[in-house]
Swiss-Prot record:
The chain crosses the membrane at residues 253-273. The keyword Glycoprotein does not apply. The lineage of its organism: Eukaryota, Metazoa, Chordata, Craniata, Vertebrata. It is an enzyme of class 1 (oxidoreductase). It is a single-pass membrane protein. It comes from Bos taurus (Bovine). One of its GO terms (cellular component) is endoplasmic reticulum membrane. This is L-gulonolactone oxidase. One of its GO terms (molecular function) is L-gulonolactone oxidase activity. It catalyses: L-gulono-1,4-lactone + O2 = L-ascorbate + H2O2 + H(+). Keywords: Ascorbate biosynthesis, Endoplasmic reticulum, FAD, Flavoprotein, Membrane, Microsome, Oxidoreductase, Transmembrane, Transmembrane helix. Residues 17-187 form the FAD-binding PCMH-type domain. Coiled coil: none annotated. Belongs to the oxygen-dependent FAD-linked oxidoreductase family.
């Protein structure tokens, strides 16, 4: 019999959202997950599944039953011939990487954070960068889904294909993902090259940058023209690192956090901070080489609020210049660095922000120095207005103000997804406040 805990308080990684579920479960088997769902049906309770808890929104929150998948974290099968790995949905990617290393395999693309679960990263449409690469869910070739009534569906392009196209970005509302099969590639090393540029240069030569580097992204420092360009490409060079505790931590974290805290009293300092830290930390060329997963992932040191929308790739220049013009016209609106700009190939996953179009993701950020919230509403609203104007779609894991009406316009397949959701979960067992805004 599965045991539930009362009095557990859940908080996301950034401590920006939290909840107190009525019961908190940590199942170790499919049968135990089934027991939780049976209990929920019997007591008419809602259920939310949580993984690494990194989503900077309330997508995982509930006052009903919460299932934490951390104890269902095994590698079930490695097929070296097909280069595929099947894992339980609760495995952290950080724990999967060394297992793949043993077999000479790797995932072709990863997000910045690896303390996230296999079931969670596909659920929210996690992405990285690389115009030849899709969001992480495009690497999923099969999955198993436990539905509200206790049925297990085996899903792939050849079995329950329509559910598969929905479940690869499932928002946690179709059922409980039990296993995920990922398409891997042979293990590879990456060289990361970082160098300074300007916003004008990067936007004027965007196609050239995208052709030059397989995994190209750039960081714009608001209230300036400064840009840090980041190329990541296959290499045979031995591992090397430009990491330095003094610059990365003493300056890049401790001093920055202190100055950002001071700027909560003197907001005019933010532009100076952005320019100063670009000059201090990003004004020269740097190179790092390592195994792919050690280059793709990096440590997020700051608690933060973020927004991240995917827009049509061809709208990149227009959107960024409009955001820059808005900040120049409204000097009281301040924006922390960086605005991170990444690029992703289009796909056919029903609620993927990259559905049927190559996309540019534009991530804005406001840090919380020493846990203190910084006024961001004007910046947030101006950004959302620009994103909607250019046809943007918000990252599902990150906070946004969109409703069903917005999503019906944004997603050609939204009604198809809704029909699948209503068929798999007719009573709304897997809904919560966040998802009610999406579907109602």
């Amino acid at each position: 019999m599965v045991h539930g805990y009362k009095g557990v308080k859940f908080q996301n990684w950034a401590r920006t959202y939290g909840c107190c579920p009525e019961m908190y479960f940590q199942p170790t088997s499919v049968e135990e997950v089934r027991e939780v769902l049976a209990l929920a049906r019997q007591q008419n309770k809602r259920v939310k599944v949580v993984g690494g808890g990194h989503s900077p929104s309330d997508i995982a929150c509930t006052d009903g039953f919460m299932i934490h998948m951390g104890k269902m974290n095994r590698v079930l099968k490695v097929d070296t011939e097909k280069k595929q790995v099947t894992v339980e949905a609760g495995i952290l990617l950080a724990d999967l990487h060394p297992q793949l290393d043993k077999h000479g395999l790797a995932l072709s693309n990863l997000g910045a954070v690896s303390d996230v679960t296999a079931g969670g990263v596909i659920g929210s449409g996690t992405h990285n960068t690389g115009i030849k690469h899709g969001i992480l869910a495009t690497q999923v070739v099969a999955l198993t889904l436990l539905t509200a009534n206790g049925t297990i569906l085996e899903c792939s392009e050849s079995s329950n294909a329509e559910v598969f196209q929905a479940a690869r970005v499932h928002l946690g509302c179709l059922g409980v993902i039990l296993t995920v099969t990922l398409q891997c590639v042979p293990q590879f090393h990456l060289q990361e090259t970082t160098f300074p540029s300007t916003l004008k240069e990067v936007l004027d030569n965007l196609d050239s940058h995208l052709k030059k580097s397989e995994y190209f992204r750039f960081l714009w420092f608001p209230h300036s023209e400064n840009v840090s360009v980041i190329y990541q490409d296959h290499t045979n060079k031995p591992p090397s690192s430009s990491a330095n505790w003094f610059w990365d931590y003493a300056i890049g974290f401790y001093l920055l956090e202190f100055l950002l805290w001071i700027s909560t009293f003197l907001p005019g300092l933010v532009g100076w901070i952005n320019r100063f830290f670009f000059w201090l930390l990003f004004n020269g060329k740097k190179e790092n080489c390592n195994l792919s997963h050690k280059i793709f992932t990096y440590e997020c040191r700051f608690k933060q609020h973020v927004q991240d929308w995917a827009i049509p790739r061809e709208k990149t220049k227009e959107a960024l210049l409009e955001l820059k013009a808005m900040l120049e016209a409204n000097p009281k609106v301040v924006a922390h660095y960086p605005v991170e700009v990444r690029f992703t190939r289009g796909d056919d996953i029903l609620l993927s922000p990259c559905f049927q179009r190559d996309s540019c993701y534009m991530n804005i950020i406001m840090y919380r120095p020493y846990g203190k919230d910084v006024p961001r509403l004007d910046y947030w609203l101006a950004y959302e207005t620009i994103m909607k104007k250019v046809g943007g779609r918000p990252h599902w894991a990150k906070a946004h103000n969109c409703t069903r009406k917005d999503f019906e316009k944004m997603y050609p397949a939204f009604q198809r997804f809704c029909a699948i959701r209503e068929k798999l979960d007719p009573t709304g067992m897997f809904l919560n406040a966040y998802l009610e805004k999406v579907f109602y």
